[in-house]
C-alpha cells in the first residue's frame, strides 16, 4: 500500500485538528518546615487567603498566613507522611463542604465527610464554609417562636426563629442538655437541626447521637463532629462548616437551628493555631481577631425576607422567608463572665441563658439564673398564651431571690412578704424539668395558668411536681379538647380560661395526687 504525499499531509492535518491538549497552570511550592500541623511553604507566589492547598497523599491544607517569602498553612487531617521538601500545589479553590437533604440523619466531620459508617453522602452540591452574612435589607425581624419545650426558657427567655441566644455557664451545669432538649422539641415543627460538637470527648458525642436516634430526632438533624482527638484546624473550621449546611436550608425558605457546642473550645483551637503561626498574642494570649472569629460566624444566623430567598433559589421559591437560629454555648471558669471570650460572645448575641453551678447542685435543673438571663428580641416572637401567662414568673423569681437573701436575717416577716416568698419557692419548684421531658405549649400553659390562679398555693412544695404531673394526666384524659384548642390557636380566650378553671377545680376536688 502506497500513500502519496497529499494523503500523508491530510492525515497529519486531521490528527493535529483532532488533538486535544489540556494544560494546567498551578503554582507549586515546597515545604520548608512542618511543626504540629502547621507548615511553612516557599514558592507559592499567587496563593489566596483561605485557599485550599494540595499536599502529597491527597491531604489538604488551608492557607492562613501570607508573608513576603513564605505561606503559613494548617493541615486538615493526618500529616505524618509529609516531610520537608515535599511539593505543595495551589488549587485555586476555597474550602467547601457538601450541603443538602442527603446529610440529614448523618454524622460527618468538619469537612463534611461521613464518619458514621453508613456509606457516602450524595450531596446536592458544595458550598464554601466562609460566606458573607445577609445584609441589613435582606433581613426580616424575628417574630416567630422557636419553642424549646422547657418551661423556664419559653416563659422567661423566649427564643425566636433567626435569633442568636447564648447558653453560658461553668462545666457540668447542663448547657448541652438545654440545647439537646431544644433539638428534640423540634420534632414535627418543620425545623432542620445541626449539632456541631467541638473539642468534646467522642464518648459524649456518641451518647448524644444515640439519644437523638432513640427519640427519632436524627431524621431532621445533622451532627458535625470535631472531637478532642482531632487537630486544632478541624476544631477551628467545624462551626463554619455546620453554618454553611444550615444556610442551605435557610436560603431555600426553610427554618433551621444550629447548636455550637462549644465556642470556647473553638477559640482555644484558634489561639493554638495563631500562636504556632507566630501571630502576635493579645489579651489571654488570644490573637487580635478573636472577636471577628465569632462575629462573622454568628452574624450568619438570621431571619431573611422573601426577596432574599427568591434570589437565592433563582426564583424557584417565592413568598417564603427563611431563618437560621443559633444557640452558641460558652463555658466559663468559676462563673467569670467577664473573661475575654464570654464578653465577646455576649456582646454579639441577642441574649443569654445563664446557668449556675449553685442552682444545679441544689437540684434546680435547668439551672437558669432568672435575674441574669435575658432574651433581647425573643419577646416579640413569644407564643401569645405563654406571654400572657408567663409574664410575672421572671419578676416573681427575681424578687424571690432578693427577698430570700433578706429573709435569712429577719426574724419575723409580714404576711405580704411571706406570701411572696411562698409564691417564689413554688415558681422555682415548678420551673424544674427532667432532661428529655420537653413539653407542648398547651401543657406549659396549663402549669403557668394553675400557678397564676393560685391553685398551687395549698399544695405542699415537695408534692408540687407530682401534683403538676397528675393534673396534666387528668386534663389530657378528661378534657383533651381544651389542650388541643390551646395547641392549635396558641391563645387563651375567656371561654378556654373558664373551661381550664373548671377542669383544675374538678381535679382538686377529686384529690387524686
From Swiss-Prot:
UniProt catalytic activity: ATP + H2O + 4 H(+)(in) = ADP + phosphate + 5 H(+)(out)
GO MF term list: ADP binding; ATP binding; proton-transporting ATP synthase activity, rotational mechanism
InterPro entries cross-referenced by the UniProt entry: ATP_synth_asu-like_sf (IPR023366), ATP_synth_asu_C (IPR000793), ATP_synth_asu_C_sf (IPR038376), ATP_synth_F1_a_nt-bd_dom (IPR033732), ATP_synth_F1_asu (IPR005294), ATPase_a/bsu_AS (IPR020003), ATPase_F1/V1/A1_a/bsu_N (IPR004100), ATPase_F1/V1/A1_a/bsu_N_sf (IPR036121)
Record keyword ATP-binding present: yes
Source domain of life: Bacteria
Keywords in alphabetical order: ATP synthesis, ATP-binding, Cell inner membrane, Cell membrane, CF(1), Hydrogen ion transport, Ion transport, Membrane, Nucleotide-binding, Translocase, Transport
Gene Ontology CC annotations of this record: plasma membrane; proton-transporting ATP synthase complex
Enzyme Commission no: 7.1.2.2
Residues bound to ATP: 169-176
Compartments where found: Cell inner membrane
Matching SUPFAM superfamilies: C-terminal domain of alpha and beta subunits of F1 ATP synthase (SSF47917), N-terminal domain of alpha and beta subunits of F1 ATP synthase (SSF50615), P-loop containing nucleoside triphosphate hydrolases (SSF52540)
Protein family membership: Belongs to the ATPase alpha/beta chains family.
Cited function: Produces ATP from ADP in the presence of a proton gradient across the membrane. The alpha chain is a regulatory subunit.
PANTHER family: ATP SYNTHASE SUBUNIT ALPHA, MITOCHONDRIAL
Oligomer status and interactors: F-type ATPases have 2 components, CF(1) - the catalytic core - and CF(0) - the membrane proton channel. CF(1) has five subunits: alpha(3), beta(3), gamma(1), delta(1), epsilon(1). CF(0) has three main subunits: a(1), b(2) and c(9-12). The alpha and beta chains form an alternating ring which encloses part of the gamma chain. CF(1) is attached to CF(0) by a central stalk formed by the gamma and epsilon chains, while a peripheral stalk is formed by the delta and b chains.
Name of the protein this chain belongs to: ATP synthase subunit alpha 1
Lineage: Bacteria, Pseudomonadati, Pseudomonadota, Betaproteobacteria, Nitrosomonadales
Recorded name of the encoding gene: atpA1
